[in-house]
């Protein structure tokens, strides 16, 4: 029986979000949160009855903050906010991103500081459970005040507007909700603002990118070890003593992984046996992979914190000394910097992987392997062009790794005079992770092919399992074949993290 993810604004994890977004896990609201949601809603209604002026509830938005809104127009104000802000451009986000946005926004407003109705939280959860996925255009957010534009597209079907995907068909929002049996809602005072003034579009991208990146970091060690094994690499460079006197945690862990993976190899060598030192792409694998791991720890911690944060404005603090306070929790800068960091650290994983690919295919560098890892070179091109593909991907990553978070263009007539560009950063980071997965999967193909030119039986205990995992899907390439299906199969092994799962079954958990 599939686990049901219960949301309460405090305990949602990266794995929970992925379970809902990618694998369709069901969701429900923690019953204990209902009183907190009701309490914050009660504060809003009492403030309105007392004619208290509150930003975005009975005033305009942004530069219109000082324009009062009459009681009769409060619901119209919220509807107009969604209408006007739903102006995104570009391709629609993938369904898994939209689902991540939905669960993350529901989680944030369920915490009890947003002043929404319980029915509003449950509408998002019911849509997730029924498979109603708003069509959310991917471009148009500057990352402060939150992700207004994409989240407005997310809200449209909730009020019977916009478009949504349901059972593979693009329908009007109203029709999708009706077919799925999910009731639409009427936005009450503050609710439109509470739904769109948050960081959940950048976070939808961020959570999935972080999840995939974490799997890739360990698999990069696995694939690198197979390349090192196939090339007869010098294992002295991974000696524990070297890494303990430069005690960066990521470097120590990566070196430990390599030793564990290469244990029992009859292909690896010792310094001085055949050569004194290996090229940096082999010898410095722990230092490069380790630096990315260390930076990743910061990225993951930031994203984990944001998952259970309240990021709208103004915020309701109900109770005896209740207050509604305007602040800046919608500002995406924490995620913007983290996503730029993720893009950079993943670019480096791909960069060094591509250099190992070059070492495997280049006969001047491969210590006895045939040119481009193929018999009868000339009539066969072998693995020549996959290296081009890897080079193209790492080159594109270098452009994408330019930080978005250092840019800011003022908006709303300079009222919102510093913005994060965090959603741009998160979209870029997700693309870079995808590219890095492809590059590492190309290295896996090359390393396994290289191993077969010697004797795969001589591989280490971990590298042998990595080799076997690929060979279950992809055979040794005797002569040129249509290549992209092989690359697709190798990519799926990396994307699904089956490589990691299989290797860890044999040698135990990697660091």
UniProtKB/Swiss-Prot annotation:
The UniProt entry, under InterPro entries, shows: Aromatic_Lyase, Fumarase/histidase_N, HutH, L-Aspartase-like, Phe/His_NH3-lyase_AS
* A molecular-function term among this protein's GO annotations: histidine ammonia-lyase activity
**Which reaction is the catalytic activity of this chain?**
L-histidine = trans-urocanate + NH4(+)
Q: Pfam families annotated for this entry?
A: Lyase_aromatic (PF00221)
Q: Which PROSITE patterns match?
A: PAL_HISTIDASE (PS00488)
For the modification 2,3-didehydroalanine (Ser), which residues carry it?
145
Q: In which pathway does it act?
A: Amino-acid degradation; L-histidine degradation into L-glutamate; N-formimidoyl-L-glutamate from L-histidine: step 1/3
Keywords for this protein: Cytoplasm, Histidine metabolism, Lyase
Q: Which domain of life is it from?
A: Bacteria
EC number, as in UniProt? 4.3.1.3
- BP-aspect Gene Ontology terms: L-histidine catabolic process; L-histidine catabolic process to glutamate and formamide; L-histidine catabolic process to glutamate and formate
* Cross-link position per record: 5-imidazolinone (Ser-Gly): 144-146
Q: How is it modified after translation?
A: Contains an active site 4-methylidene-imidazol-5-one (MIO), which is formed autocatalytically by cyclization and dehydration of residues Ser-Ser-Gly.
Question: What compartments host this protein?
Answer: Cytoplasm
Major location (coarse) = cytoplasm
Answer yes or no on keyword tRNA-binding.
no
Recorded GO cellular component terms are:
cytoplasm
The answer to whether keyword Membrane applies is: no
- Which PANTHER family would you find in this protein's record? HISTIDINE AMMONIA-LYASE
Query: Into which family does the record put it?
Result: Belongs to the PAL/histidase family.
By what name is this protein known?
Histidine ammonia-lyase 2
